[in-house]
Amino acid sequence: LTIPGEGSVSAMSWTDVTATNFYFDTKDYPGLVGVSFEANMRLANGNGYGYVRLFDVTNGIAVTGSENNTNSQSSVWTKSQEVYFWAGKNLIRVQAKSLTADTTVYSQGRLRIVTEN
């Protein structure tokens, strides 16, 4: 599942990445075995680490297991641990931050969804 949007964040606290909203409902995937979040990202100056995660706007929580990070100045694909969504049709968006004042650049993302079927 491709996640829309891209953007950059120069903040040390979690900040929404513009236009990355999408809806996700586990019921839409019968036989769901697991989900991971893959993000193409980089850290503009390689100063510290850049982070991205998924945020469940509907329930006001970070999506468990969804955090990715890199210290690369070149765009790289990163992969989260297994991601756990709350039940129901939830509005999800990408958030980003860095541990320094460097800029985290999020280029694209996707959910890798594994089902039994």
Enumerate the predicted regions with their spans.
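Extracellular jelly-roll beta-sandwich "head" domains, especially the C-terminal globular C1q domain
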Residues: 1-117
